[in-house]
Amino acid sequence: MGKKKQKKGQGSRLEVIFDEEKRREYLTGFHKRKMQRRKTAVEEIKRKIKEEQKKMKEERHKEYMKMLKEREEALCELEENDELEEMVTSKTESVRYDHPNHTVTVTTISDLDLSGIRVPPLGNAEQKQEEEKVEEENEKGADEEKPKTSVSLPKKSGDPFLSKKICSLTASLHARSQRKSGKRPSRTNENKKQTSSKMSGRTSKTQRRKQTGKTRRRRN
């Protein structure tokens, strides 16, 4: 009689007990976790788009202020040049004489109209005061008649704040939203086509070939 083999470790058995609720939640929660991951991804993409738009807005504002500053400087230069041109009454070009050993250039200074600078005329002090009063009154009237001129601001472009990064993020967001709302194509159309062909009595070429093959086999 052979000895019966004793099973090893009978006293040290381990039992694994699962929590039924957690087990059921894990097994049935694949779709739920997938939707949660998709939701977090969409929120992250939206956050990145907002940050990129804010960055682009700040860059556009800096460019706009730079353009405004350049325009104001250009307008100031033009006004100064216009004032100088009004004061100058005659202009002469410089003449250059070539000599074998020397080069001589002769330039003449343009005559200025000193009446624009308001030089006080020669005369009595009373006449000067009266003329100054008349000039002040004329200036006040001219200031009232002149409309208030303001520096024309550069127009802002109506284009949206878009960049390559924003375009790529919006494309991925659009793709994810389409995946979420998209449904699998149903086979109802195919079934409808089959039923309509049966009801009408028409058969396709492949169906006719199958039928002729079956009849030939039966005859053989």
Swiss-Prot record:
Tagged with keyword Nucleus: yes
Subcellular location: Nucleus, Nucleolus
Parts of the chain that traverse the membrane: none
Record InterPro entries: Nucleolar_protein_12
Domain of life according to the entry: Eukaryota
GO MF annotation, one: rRNA binding
GO CC field: nucleolus
Keyword Cell membrane: no
Coiled-coil portions: 31-86
Biased composition (Basic and acidic residues): 139-148
Keyword field: Coiled coil, Nucleus, RNA-binding, rRNA-binding
Chain intervals for the UniProt region annotation (Disordered): 109-220
Biased composition (Basic residues): 176-186, 205-220
Similarity section: Belongs to the RRP17 family.
Function noted in UniProt: May bind to rRNA.
Record protein name field: Nucleolar protein 12
Phylogenetic classification of the source organism: Eukaryota, Metazoa, Chordata, Craniata, Vertebrata
